From Swiss-Prot:
Residues 1-21, 150-179, 285-405 are annotated as: Disordered. Residues 312-331, 349-358 have a biased composition (Acidic residues). The lineage of its organism: Viruses, Varidnaviria, Bamfordvirae, Nucleocytoviricota, Megaviricetes. It comes from Acanthamoeba polyphaga mimivirus. It comes from the Viruses. This is Uncharacterized protein R505. Residues 7-16 have a biased composition (Polar residues). Residues 365-374, 390-405 have a biased composition (Basic residues).
């Protein structure tokens, strides 16, 4: 099969220097001009590298295709361990992107036509014989344009439960009712660096009329940038034909197909429906703080209590001055702070000295009560002496009590 080259769509030249990178638009590649190298049978697969005989340059170039704008309404980079992608455990299992071929989008339709032409060309009996010779019947071509498999839901009850779980997991993946959307599976350009795989697919973010290159070393970092509903453009490299060395489990023939890589992605980020932990931030606690301030007034109350204590100390100093004038009132004031019952006892002492003496004898069981009673007797008997020397009253009050005892 052959396909005419569209002369109106000339290849892109990045510069006029001796080294030029030629990029083609879809539907401009003539499959008959594809040059296929000999098989390299080293490694896990056979590989035959591809070049393109450019009719305008009369030289071999790489098969680099640039797409028009494609919106990621479907497919994209698979998620880890969700729904139909439950077998994906890490980034190593998803080093590719499914480029959707959404019906009605010019960029998708143009890309689909180009890859359908490639699939038709390389799956032909003539090409299979050219590649594998007498073993041609033992190989089956895997198309680049793929149709998602739809699981039959009319199975057992357990299958119904699994289907429900998958529906929940794939609810927000952009799937719509109607026929399944086809896609092209293209691998990211990954290289080995100190035992780790590093992405070399170029990411160019387009936003607000400005373009900037974004560094993304891992598939997770790519997925965080090229999200669902992003508007994307791709530079794709059809670089080789690969062929399996053995028959896969459940298959009857060995598989072969084209190798497709994504070399660059220009994208305008879409509105994300998921959560990105990097964008999470705590709100201010202004409202909560206002509620907390109310109970924190308790230390103010304690300060007020301290002030009251200071005031009481000042009052005590004033009372000491009053003691010099009238000591009996001071003793009644102290006894009133201890208990109301003692006030009544003191008043009775002032009214009746004999009853006071009886109460003193009753309270002699405790040392504190005996001392207070002796002080009261001394104050009643020696009023003049206490008024003359109020500051040394406590010491003189104790001495006569000891002499009497």
């Amino acid at each position: 099969m052959s396909k005419k080259v569209n002369k109106n769509a000339s290849p892109k030249n990045n510069s006029d220097s001796e080294s030029k990178t030629i990029i083609y638009r879809p539907n401009t590649i003539d499959c008959d001009r594809i040059d296929i190298a000999d098989w390299n049978k080293d490694g896990k697969q056979w590989n035959a590298w591809l070049n393109y005989q450019d009719p305008n340059l009369n030289s071999n170039t790489k098969i680099l295709l640039q797409t028009k704008t494609i919106e990621l309404k479907h497919h994209g980079i698979p998620r880890i361990g969700e729904g139909e992608d439950a077998f994906i455990k890490s980034d190593a299992d998803r080093e590719y992107i499914k480029i959707p071929l959404t019906p009605g989008e010019p960029g998708c339709e143009e890309l689909e036509q180009q890859f359908q032409a490639l699939d038709e060309y390389f799956s032909s009996d003539e090409m299979r014989t050219k590649l594998f010779g007498k073993r041609a019947n033992g190989y089956k071509y895997v198309t680049c344009v793929k149709t998602p498999k739809i699981k039959d839901e009319s199975d057992s009850d357990s299958d119904d439960e699994d289907t429900k779980k998958k529906k929940k997991n794939t609810k927000n993946k952009g799937k719509q009712e109607g026929p399944p959307v086809k896609y092209i599976k293209a691998k990211f350009h990954m290289i080995q660096d100190n035992g780790k795989k590093i992405n070399r697919t170029k990411l160019i973010k387009s936003s607000g009329g400005k373009k900037e290159e974004v560094n993304a070393d891992t598939v997770t970092e790519i997925a965080n940038e090229v999200r669902f509903l992003s508007k994307t453009k791709y530079i794709m490299h059809v670089n080789r034909i690969w062929a399996a060395k053995s028959v896969l489990l459940g298959a009857d023939k060995k598989m072969y197909s084209l190798g497709v890589k994504v070399m660059a992605i220009e994208y305008t980020p879409g509105a994300s429906t998921g959560l990105n932990s990097k964008n999470l931030a705590f709100m201010s606690d202004d409202e909560d703080e206002e509620e907390v301030v109310k109970p924190t007034k308790s230390p103010n109350k304690s300060s007020q209590k301290q002030k009251q204590k200071l005031d009481s100390d000042d009052e005590d100093s004033d009372n000491e001055k009053e003691k010099e004038k009238e000591e009996d009132d001071e003793e009644e004031h102290k006894s009133s702070n201890k208990s109301s019952n003692k006030k009544s006892k003191k008043q009775d002492d002032d009214e009746d000295d004999e009853e006071e003496g009886e109460k003193i004898e009753v309270k002699k069981s405790s040392k504190k009560s005996s001392k207070k009673a002796s002080k009261k007797q001394d104050s009643d008997e020696e009023d003049e002496e206490e008024v003359a020397k109020p500051k040394k009253k406590s010491s003189k009050a104790k001495s006569p009590s000891k002499s009497r005892s």
